[in-house]
């Protein structure tokens, strides 16, 4: 609270086995400590070992309608089916953006939006304005290219050619080896997706 933050993206604890009851209690404790918080749930089973059920999300929203305001869905079991008024559903991949918008999702939250934000925004704006989709294929191709490698390592390696600060990573994160880095850049170049194109956008 000393930093004056109210909005949070919070994943359930990792490394422990638990169910919906314990997850609800976990978020309840946070909200009791910070009643003015606004929380986006982070649904990412591969990282924490727990996958939100629709029932659990609905129970949390029912219990805390002002505090539980959305979910980042990186397990992709919610975004096609979860419908709650005044609640944002945000898939965790650019490849799910257009389909998610068609289903009523609010947008996306993704790591690769650090480089794909311009394309993602165009897909979003064209959907809202009912224009022809001209950027979605490239957006998905860029995302799929990064996914062929360790995604976070790939992002840092790609961006480090423009700013060496991106080489500064803490274990267990590491940069791609030189062979994989060059392969990533070559595949992105084939899509006409370069650091130069990002700066121009």
Name each region found by the language model.
Residues 133-136, 156, 185:
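Conserved positions within tetratricopeptide repeat
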Residues 101-102, 138-174:
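Conserved short secondary-structure transition element at the edge of the structured enzyme core
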Residues 31-37, 44-149:
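Catalytic alpha/beta core domains of metabolic enzymes, predominantly
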Residues 2-4, 64, 86, 104, ...:
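Glycine-centered loop/turn motif at secondary-structure junctions
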Residues 164-198:
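Flexible C-terminal active-site loop/helix
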């Amino acid at each position: 609270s000393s930093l004056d933050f109210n909005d949070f993206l919070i994943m359930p604890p990792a490394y422990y086995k638990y169910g919906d009851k314990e997850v609800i209690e976990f978020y309840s404790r946070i909200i009791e400590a910070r009643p003015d918080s606004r929380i986006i749930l982070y649904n990412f089973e591969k990282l924490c070992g727990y996958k939100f059920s629709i029932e659990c999300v609905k129970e949390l929203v029912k219990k805390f309608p002002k505090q539980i305001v959305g979910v980042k869905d990186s397990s992709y079991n919610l975004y096609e089916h979860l419908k709650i008024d005044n609640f944002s559903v945000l898939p965790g991949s650019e490849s799910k953006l257009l389909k998610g918008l068609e289903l009523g999702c609010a947008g996306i939250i993704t790591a690769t939006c650090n480089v794909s934000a311009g394309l993602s925004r165009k897909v979003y704006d064209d959907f809202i304005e009912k224009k022809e989709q001209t950027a979605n294929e490239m957006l998905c191709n860029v995302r799929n290219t990064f996914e062929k490698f360790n995604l976070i390592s790939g992002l840092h390696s790609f961006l480090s050619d423009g700013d060496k600060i991106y080489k500064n990573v803490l274990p267990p994160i590491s940069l791609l080896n030189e062979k994989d880095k060059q392969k990533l850049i070559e595949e992105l170049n084939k899509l006409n997706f370069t650091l130069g194109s990002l700066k121009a956008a």
